[in-house]
Design a protein with these regions (language model features):
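Charged, low-complexity intrinsically disordered regions
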Residues: 1-175
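Conserved pre-motif I regulatory segment
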Residues: 163-219
């Protein structure tokens, strides 16, 4: 059990403990052996709306690429993002031309991408309904795809940012080791002599003994 769960947090704890006698060295060595491999930036896909990328990095992206001052806010409890141009900020050509269209500027497309939504352009009809404008929608979605692609490469272009975000990703997603319940050593008293349990069945018994509870979905 000790070598499962968030082993990175356990390893960090052992490394920071005042240990003049080296009592924690075996723990550190064991945890290092099972620690998941750190992924490199080239192995990580950075997409707009990924919860491990802070808002400030997206705001910096807007400053450098869109030439715009944008407030980006993430509400993790709702899984929602908002992006809006700051009051008094000028609207750059990049917003409505290079990274946006006349019907959907780059901030609108950024907001859609952050929320994993494809933007749709609609027109009002004489009776007050709204219908999709296929040509304008296609143009907007092409710009949205270009924007998301640019972001995925921009994230890793600056070394300090790449190191920081790769570290954050690994801390969140490359720190957990699933428990390995091995029941091959169990004697199972009372078991019928004509029945030989399989490896996964012995493992299930070991898990029950360890956790005190389990749901078995084995085929019969």
């Amino acid at each position: 059990e000790y070598l499962s769960g968030n082993v990175r947090a356990k390893l960090d704890t052992c490394r920071t403990v005042d240990d003049p006698d080296g009592r924690y060295r075996p723990n550190i060595a064991a945890l290092e052996r099972v620690l998941p491999r750190q992924l490199e930036p080239t192995e990580i896909t950075a997409r707009l709306g990924a919860p491990w990328i802070p808002s400030r990095d997206i705001e910096q992206f807007c400053h450098e690429v869109l030439d715009a001052s944008v407030d980006v806010e993430h509400l993790p409890q709702l899984g929602n993002w908002t992006a809006r141009l700051r009051d008094g900020s000028r609207r750059s050509v990049a917003l409505s031309s290079e990274w946006g269209t006349g019907r959907a500027d780059a901030i609108t497309l950024l907001d859609a991408a952050l929320n994993q939504r494809l933007h749709t352009v609609t027109d009002a009809t004489d009776d007050g309904k709204r219908i999709r404008n296929d040509a304008a929608t296609l143009a907007a979605r092409d710009k949205q795809e270009a924007l998301t692609t640019k972001f995925s490469t921009w994230v890793w272009e600056e070394p300090e940012r790449a190191t920081r975000l790769a570290g954050r990703y690994n801390e969140l997603f490359s720190s957990t080791v699933l428990p390995n319940h091995d029941g091959d050593h169990l004697t199972l008293p009372g078991l019928a002599g004509t029945f030989t349990p399989r490896h996964h069945q012995r493992a299930a018994v070991a898990r029950i003994l360890t956790d005190g509870r389990a749901l078995l979905a084995h085929a019969v």
